[in-house]
């Protein structure tokens, strides 16, 4: 898969650290919050957030110490020349019509016809 060649090991380590951090922040599935308590918490959070000043956008959030070092001695996740092609490829994939994402040969209709006759490049997807 050509996608594996684009992502560096350092980026994978950053993704892993981010995932670990998010998993620590997520509540356990065993914890059940009553709807009334949840709505009260939402109201309290809304009141607190409305009292806070406007926060700058994400690229401007990193302070000078984060820009120079970061946790792993690397720069932050900013829009660098290295990540720009990856972002554009991901954006193009998300913006592509569903049939283009699904099919690698002729299109959805031809793939279904090929699957019925065991011909075509994506016949394994539609077997029943």
UniProtKB/Swiss-Prot annotation:
InterPro entries according to UniProt: Natr_peptide, Natr_peptide_CS, Natriuretic_peptide, Natriuretic_peptide_atrial
One Pfam family cited in the UniProt record for this chain: ANP
Chain spans, region Disordered: 36-84
Protein name per its UniProtKB record: Natriuretic peptides A
Removed propeptide positions: 68-78
Alphabetized GO MF terms: hormone activity; hormone receptor binding
Disulfide bonds: 105-121
Disulfide bond recorded as keyword: yes
Listed GO biological process terms: blood vessel diameter maintenance; cGMP biosynthetic process; cGMP-mediated signaling; female pregnancy; negative regulation of systemic arterial blood pressure; neuropeptide signaling pathway; receptor guanylyl cyclase signaling pathway; regulation of blood pressure
UniProt modification remark: The precursor molecule is proteolytically cleaved by CORIN at Arg-98 to produce atrial natriuretic peptide. Undergoes further proteolytic cleavage by unknown proteases to give rise to long-acting natriuretic peptide, vessel dilator and kaliuretic peptide. Additional processing gives rise to the auriculin and atriopeptin peptides. In the kidneys, alternative processing by an unknown protease results in the peptide urodilatin.
Family (UniProt): Belongs to the natriuretic peptide family.
Keyword RNA-binding tagged: no
Phosphoserine: modified positions: 104
Organism: Cavia porcellus
Keywords per UniProt: Cell projection, Disulfide bond, Hormone, Phosphoprotein, Secreted, Vasoactive
Region (Important for degradation of atrial natriuretic peptide by IDE): 122-126
Site note Cleavage, residues: 98-99, 105-106
Annotated GO CC locations: cell projection; cytoplasm; extracellular space; perikaryon
